[in-house]
Amino acid sequence: MTKKIAMIHPTAIVHENAIIGKDVEIGPYTIIGDRVEIGDNCWIAPHVVIKGPTKMGKGNKIYQFASIGEDCQDLKYNGEETFLEIGDNNVFRESCTVHRGTAQDQGTTRIGNNNLLMAYVHVAHDCVLGNNIILSNNATLAGHTKLANNVIIGGLSALHQFTRVGEFAMIGGCSAVNKDIPPYFMATGNYVEAQGVNSVGLKRSGFNSKAIMEIKRAYKILCREGNSLEQAKIKIAEKLEGCPELQVLYDFICEESRGIVR
């Protein structure tokens, strides 16, 4: 069902079962597939392909040659019904690829709100992205990767399957990420290593000086004092009272499964 108020170029192909919101613009030669739902005020450039089942919210911008909601590249995928869910006000630049989930996980790839995916970014099956994330050109997320809010990933970086990146973490360009990166950390390298606390980013985001100081102390405990991970957990746990930001870090390292970048 297509609402008349949408502006659809005559060369675009929109499936009869697609649901198009108000004030949506769809450019030339774009293909909108079956079971695709596009929210209000979205802008879709020429030569975009969106395949369903995909649901996106309002205010998203998708640039030319992006492929959104395609089948995943997991060799175990056998045509099962899987999904892609996208929130509001995201930007997908040229040639981005975002794949639907797999039956082996939750079946759904999820992207939150206000994210910027620059040119040639790849988001694989079953990834979960929060809000206010920046993925620079050619950043690649393997399957089942999870990014918390306010993460920044530099260009040409690649994240291994099942890795997690905590909130406000920053990854330098050309990095190979094979372990979890805790909240607030900066990390870079091949393979990636911790490089300190993202102090500038935290200040810009309104973190107070006390919280940043406690995060830096926790970083030293984890990465610079020679503690085992279990020893570091015990020492950080002793400092949690009155610092919710530190609680976020502590909870993250307690849930690690691939190891922590240190």
Swiss-Prot record:
Pfam families: Acetyltransf_11 (PF13720), Hexapep (PF00132). One of its GO terms (cellular component) is cytoplasm. InterPro entries: Acetyltransf_C (IPR029098), Acetyltransf_C_sf (IPR037157), Hexapep (IPR001451), Lipid_A_LpxA (IPR010137), Trimer_LpxA-like_sf (IPR011004). It is an enzyme of class 2 (transferase). The keyword Cytoplasm applies. Belongs to the transferase hexapeptide repeat family. LpxA subfamily. Homotrimer. GO terms for biological process: lipid A biosynthetic process. The gene is lpxA. It catalyses: a (3R)-hydroxyacyl-[ACP] + UDP-N-acetyl-alpha-D-glucosamine = a UDP-3-O-[(3R)-3-hydroxyacyl]-N-acetyl-alpha-D-glucosamine + holo-[ACP]. SUPFAM superfamilies: Trimeric LpxA-like enzymes. The lineage of its organism: Bacteria, Pseudomonadati, Pseudomonadota, Gammaproteobacteria, Alteromonadales. It comes from Psychromonas ingrahamii (strain DSM 17664 / CCUG 51855 / 37). One of its GO terms (molecular function) is acyl-[acyl-carrier-protein]-UDP-N-acetylglucosamine O-acyltransferase activity. HAMAP family: LpxA. Its EC number is 2.3.1.129. Involved in the biosynthesis of lipid A, a phosphorylated glycolipid that anchors the lipopolysaccharide to the outer membrane of the cell. This is Acyl-[acyl-carrier-protein]--UDP-N-acetylglucosamine O-acyltransferase. CDD domains: LbH_UDP-GlcNAc_AT. Pathway: Glycolipid biosynthesis; lipid IV(A) biosynthesis; lipid IV(A) from (3R)-3-hydroxytetradecanoyl-[acyl-carrier-protein] and UDP-N-acetyl-alpha-D-glucosamine: step 1/6. It is found in: Cytoplasm. Keywords: Acyltransferase, Cytoplasm, Lipid A biosynthesis, Lipid biosynthesis, Lipid metabolism, Repeat, Transferase.
